[in-house]
Amino acid sequence: MDKIQRAAADLAQKYGLNAPAMARYTDLASEMGELGKELLLGSNYGADELKITDDTAKEMGDVLFSLAMLANSLDLDLEECFDKAIGKYQKRFGQTGQIGSQT
């Protein structure tokens, strides 16, 4: 478990924030929406160049916290998951010249 997951787990234990994985997934989706809203606002809905604000950074932090809480509820190590994803993308790029799936 990495530093971020450990900090999230400590906070959850301290304040009784444990919840089932589906609740954590829903929270993550909600936080992603809030980040998306900040990106839209920061670019005037795509009309202007994106300006990163303190609110953008706060929402990114909320997304990261929610992802760590979801991973903890699933007993998954985010760093291991990330390493597997990087390996998958490197292999795919080596085979196809792209990282996107062909499904």
PLM region spans:
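Flexible "arm" and connector segments at domain edges
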Residues: M1-M60, L64-T103
